[in-house]
Amino acid sequence: MSVDTANPTSPMMETHEQIFAQDPDFWKNYRRGRPQVPYSFFQRIYNYHQGHSGRFETVHDAGAGNGVYSKELRSKFHHVIVSDVVAENVRQAEERLGTEGYSFRVGKMEELDEIPAASVDMVFVMNAMHWADDQTRAMRAIAAQLRPGGTFACAGFGPARFRDARVQDVWERISQQGGRLLLQTANQPVDTINVMVRSQDHYNVAPLDERLFRQRALRIYLNQETGGLTGLLPPERRGEVTEPDHEGPHDQITFEHDDEWRFDMDLDGFKEHFRTFPHAFRDPEAFTSLWQEIEELVRQGSRLDGAWPVTLILATRTNA
């Protein structure tokens, strides 16, 4: 099983921003190879927001990439602020979405000071919160943007979790090999290790200061009965993790199963999913023996099916 890596990345030292500075072809494949998000997921967010008397005027789609979910948000909100740390991603978003009902910003979510205080009804962060090195600072910036009673909606999903334990084992080793390749070119390896640990398992992000967010925020773990998000962190680098646990003492933790997030891939679909990760565009030979293991498992009758694990965090801004 060969994987076409037509967009090789330079072996120079890279920042977090450079890792996900990808061209339009990457984002097209990203939409195909990542979960097709069911509408019930968005409806749960909208219902939470409405249930806490939230307005549907302005939403900030932070860390939006090239606006993967911005059009969906525009179907409910009058105005969507689309922001990303990568200028090229924002340019692609503006080109694809147009400007009616949208505005565009380039910058880190913890540094977008030009967004007026208490001017946003919802801050929506999908698959991006783990990139903020200073989680506390990022949450202060998000809280500052939100109107009293506004909603912070954050989710992490993307890496598949396969039903067959043998397939899942190989997928974990593929992911960890990708993590090794990314760490070889990371300009701040410890920071990149912490990004990896935030983005795996139960998605360890978003410390919720109860002076800024009401108690009993929701942390909902979907389809995580056998494990959370498959991570990139190589086991030999776990001793370098410095990230604290961000679950709060009063956060409401629930585990649920949702069949709408199930998938069933063939080998081409597996390849397409792999190519949604930045390490796919590195050294192809580093994965050769792992592809052979997957092919052999499929020949033996293993199915490439399972469910996407999802973490959803919902919190309400205090009135202070």
Swiss-Prot record:
Residues 61-154 are annotated as: Methyltransferase domain. Residues 231-252 are annotated as: Disordered. Pfam families: Methyltransf_11 (PF08241). The keyword S-adenosyl-L-methionine applies. The keyword Methyltransferase applies. Keywords: Methyltransferase, S-adenosyl-L-methionine, Transferase. It is an enzyme of class 2 (transferase). Belongs to the methyltransferase superfamily. Methyltransferase; part of the gene cluster that mediates the biosynthesis of geodin, an intermediate in the biosynthesis of other natural products. The pathway begins with the synthesis of atrochrysone thioester by the polyketide synthase (PKS) gedC. The atrochrysone carboxyl ACP thioesterase gedB then breaks the thioester bond and releases the atrochrysone carboxylic acid from gedC. The atrochrysone carboxylic acid is then converted to atrochrysone which is further transformed into emodinanthrone. This is Methyltransferase gedG. The gene is gedG.
